[in-house]
Design a protein with these regions (language model features):
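Active-site phosphate/pyrophosphate-binding segments
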Residues: 1-150
Length: 150
């Protein structure tokens, strides 16, 4: 059995594991798929070559996200649209309704990623902010939620 944990965790010193893969304490859950946590699981499930390709794709996305041209940076464009919808239009929520059962967990995943980061009511210094922050994210596959949400 293997463990993926921080070096300060009791699991790191346990003799119950064949190997321990370490990750820094500051790495949040949204990054765990490309940390040792996800790396071990994805490599065992799909092979190390697939995991290497995932890391390459993540590196390409990082490069894309640094482009200052809004037309060539979909991440920046999406973020600015979100700020506009929330702060100018006043939309309090965002529905995610994928029309594929294969994406049935997408709304929950996006909810965790977005709301964990953007739903704060204080700034990085712990001071209250004087503007609205991220919207409430909710949803279901469109085939289930279409009559409930719209």
């Amino acid at each position: 059995m293997l463990t993926a944990t921080s070096e300060t965790s009791p699991l790191a010193k346990s003799d119950d594991y064949l190997a321990a893969f370490f990750m820094d304490d500051f790495i949040g859950g949204r990054y765990s798929s490309v940390s040792s946590v996800g790396g071990v699981i994805l490599s065992l499930a799909f092979g190390p070559d697939v995991f290497a390709r995932i890391l390459d794709g993540m590196a390409e996305e990082d490069k894309l996200a640094t482009n200052k041209d809004i037309k060539a940076n979909p991440d920046l464009l999406d973020a600015l649209i979100g700020v506009y919808e929330r702060n100018v239009q006043g939309y309090p929520s965002t529905a995610v309704l994928p029309y594929s059962q294969a994406l049935s967990r997408q709304a929950i995943h996006l909810q965790q990623c977005d709301m964990e980061s953007n739903g704060k009511t204080v700034n990085r210094f712990g001071e209250p902010v004087n503007y609205v922050t991220g919207p409430v994210i909710f949803g279901e596959p469109g085939t289930n939620g279409q009559h409930s949400f719209y």
